[in-house]
Amino acid sequence: MKHRISTMVLLGGTLAALSFSSLPAQDAPNPKAAQKLARALEGRTPGKPVACIANLRGSAKMSVVDDWTILFRDGGTIYVQKPKGGCPKLSRGQYALVKRQVGGSQYCEGDIGEVVDPVSGFFAGNCVFGPFVPYRKVG
């Protein structure tokens, strides 16, 4: 019985280690993404995070830094969005971020964005929005 329990514990620990090792490394963005984000936010300071922003239409208003960071521009403010768990495949450039909404004209924390192929309409993944951090120019 002791052997069986220790085998189960070992197996469970191994499975947990394997599942955690396959998670993307959110804390270590690639250098190109870090440089792109730094350039976009140069001369700006972060404000207090907000739960919702206006639903900005048009590709010029949204830019993807990587699967972990999306920028939304509204006038002189850039909102940094870090989806909880990332937004798989979004940074590949061939996919679009679509938010299915019923009424309302905002992106809000907790909303689910879908990553889709705009040509075929096939679903490629999804992401859950976190808070939006506004960055404004200093002075």
Please provide the spans of the model-predicted regions:
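Bacterial N-terminal signal peptides that target proteins for export
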Residues: 1-10
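Bacterial N-terminal signal peptides
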Residues: 9-19
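N-terminal secretory signal peptides
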Residues: 23-78
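Disulfide-bonded cysteine motifs in exported proteins
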Residues: 47, 81-82, 103, 122
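A short macromolecule-binding patch
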Residues: 78-86
